[in-house]
Amino acid sequence: MIEFDNVTITQPGADRPVLDGVTGRIRESDLCVVVGRTGSGKSTLLGAINSLVPATTGATMSGRILIDGRDITGTRPRELADLVGYVGQNPLAGFVTDTVEDEVAYGMEQLGIAPSTMRKRVEETLDLMGIAELRRRQLVELSGGQQQRVAIAAVLAAQPRVLVLDEPTSALDPNAAQDVLSAINTLVYDVGLTVVLAEHRLERVMHTADSAVWLRSDGRAVFGPTADVLARADVRPPLVELSGVLGWPSVATSVRNARRKVQDEGPHVVLPDLPSEPVAWSDAGLTRVVEARGLTVRYGSQLAVSADLDLHAGNVVALMGRNGSGKSSLMWALQGAVASTGTLSIAGSDPRRVGDAEARTLVSLVPQTPSDLLYLPSVGEELEQADRESHAPPGTTRAILTRLGADLPDDRNPRDLSEGQRLALVLAIQLAARPAVVCLDEPTRGLDYQMKHELAAIVRRLADDGACVVIATHDVEFTAQATDRCIVLADGDVVADGPTRVVCCASPGFSPQVAKVFHPHDVLTVAEVSSALAAQGLAKAPA
């Protein structure tokens, strides 16, 4: 269905191709997942399938891409609308109308489709994506998962043969992600569409993917069945990592598959059982740095969050909950950056009633898009500015950056850094004032598994140095690996609060894959399984 014939793509100003001699084939009606480290060229490959690359990027391209036998080289993206549908990472940014029904119809209007045909297709597409009841809703009022399904519906109305999705679940909570992926599976298995998607959280999609494309760091690509490709790839989701630790000859791609392998292939490691009664969170021996009572944020008549909260030094705390549950609003309220009511004390002061200089010593916040805080042309200038604004000795922020494990040249433009490097730079800038509380809003978006491991080590060092680290996230695997305590929000209220392993194991929606594989045993991560194997003489502990 899709053939890549020696495709090489070089971005403007780059000294080497991001894709180099890519050759391979994706079969018709496959669900194909594109995998690779951050910056390996996944978005570039997806963009090339509908000619967004090189048409809109200024990149140079050689080789050919054929879709259903048609050479699309040099074709304008608009001319491929009936062949390839494309949905980018931020569906809301791509909407051009106000309501769901208008958005689904818009693309067909631009293609000049007859009104009678258009009306029929709109109805069919709304039903197919399960959004018929949303037809008159304002797009901005929809949840993230609903917006994603509308974006897919809008391109499906033109009846393309191929659907390309760039990070379709990266901004979604686990349940919303499952809704979107269920809709995608329907398109593949019931409609026969060919779907190509990139997704950093492979644990969400690899169990249903028919095939995979691994983009290597040298620009080359490996095509093949999902399990075979993941066994070789340099990105290792939890089940793939677990397969290696347990010595299985083939990787498990689903929880069901892994549970069966544990029974049939072993090794049969002894693990503790979950406690019969939930263990409550205890602050014994901890120093309280945050005390909030009735902390409430409203946007007009809409209640965003209302919470009583105590947070402690040396702890890493996860804020979880569905999209719109109040996680980001709570963190902005802790920083004093949004209007709120109720009492708030951080290290003895209320950040809403102090000057900017003192506020920096109370709470720092790294937003979902860290680059929003970078506005100078070089890393060195950003570091020097942070020292001045924090009234810190020269070199303070550079020393923090080094401690975070990022050795970035002073002359590098922040816009040229990887996602992980930008996150480390912004975190160092925010830490220059030595805040008591460090807030991170969805820090794992755009990070591959190795970068998540590095981020987990960073936040643990921050906590060990005495900070309270608060992380708003949908990433249950990262939560299991990096946090001590988990607070779940729903409609602005705290509905669960306790040790991470207790809260995560109590809810299927927030359980990491390893916990599901070994349920009812008390284990959250591959590292815990590896340690148990080593303790029982069944395997060596990781170096």
Language-model-derived ranges and their functions:
Residues 155-156, 431:
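ABC ATPase C-loop
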Residues 116-134, 392-410:
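Conserved ABC ATPase "signature" region
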Residues 138-142, 146, 413-417, 421:
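Conserved ABC ATPase signature
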Residues 58-70, 342-350, 359:
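Conserved ABC transporter NBD signature motif
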